[in-house]
Amino acid sequence: MMKQFKEFAVRGNVVDMAVGIIVGGAFGKLVNTLVSDVMMPPLGFLTGGVDFTNLYFVLSEGSTPGPYAALEQARAAGAVTVNYGLFINAMISFIIMAFAVYLLVRGINSLRRKEEAAPPPSTKQCPFCLSTVPLKATRCPACTSGLEK
């Protein structure tokens, strides 16, 4: 049984999939950091200092009555909140991730693309004078020899 498991585990597809999952997880963290630490602060600055992580509304107050200055305070008080700012961050991360995957797949497909088949020839060579003649010709225009179809 261990031998079968070893054969399964070291098969190319399983190892490739494991590497893909690990690299994908790291790439996801990289994109999330890009969005939350690089893109959202300037976007917040351009929108008047809005911090998207603190965009939420309270459905039910917690043990400490609101209003809450930040989402962390609302969570600490046990308030029930809808965190649409975090959703905006996640949506932007998803769009960037999807676009990156699209570019990756597009690049791989262009590398794998097979050359298009050459169109069928429209001419042939006369066996007597070696002139180029149309494929459907029955007589060579240069030497007037009869040609086979």
UniProtKB/Swiss-Prot annotation:
<keyword id="KW-1133">Transmembrane helix</keyword>
<feature type="transmembrane region" description="Helical">
    <location>
        <begin position="85"/>
        <end position="105"/>
    </location>
</feature>
<dbReference type="InterPro" id="IPR036019">
    <property type="entry name" value="MscL_channel"/>
</dbReference>
<keyword id="KW-1003">Cell membrane</keyword>
<comment type="function">
    <text>Channel that opens in response to stretch forces in the membrane lipid bilayer. May participate in the regulation of osmotic pressure changes within the cell.</text>
</comment>
<dbReference type="InterPro" id="IPR037673">
    <property type="entry name" value="MSC/AndL"/>
</dbReference>
<keyword id="KW-0997">Cell inner membrane</keyword>
<dbReference type="Pfam" id="PF01741">
    <property type="entry name" value="MscL"/>
</dbReference>
<keyword id="KW-0407">Ion channel</keyword>
<feature type="transmembrane region" description="Helical">
    <location>
        <begin position="14"/>
        <end position="34"/>
    </location>
</feature>
<dbReference type="InterPro" id="IPR001185">
    <property type="entry name" value="MS_channel"/>
</dbReference>
<keyword id="KW-0812">Transmembrane</keyword>
<keyword id="KW-0813">Transport</keyword>
<protein>
    <recommendedName>
        <fullName>Large-conductance mechanosensitive channel</fullName>
    </recommendedName>
</protein>
<keyword id="KW-0472">Membrane</keyword>
<comment type="subunit">
    <text>Homopentamer.</text>
</comment>
<dbReference type="InterPro" id="IPR019823">
    <property type="entry name" value="Mechanosensitive_channel_CS"/>
</dbReference>
<keyword id="KW-0406">Ion transport</keyword>
<comment type="similarity">
    <text>Belongs to the MscL family.</text>
</comment>
<dbReference type="GO" id="GO:0008381">
    <property type="term" value="F:mechanosensitive monoatomic ion channel activity"/>
</dbReference>
<dbReference type="GO" id="GO:0005886">
    <property type="term" value="C:plasma membrane"/>
</dbReference>
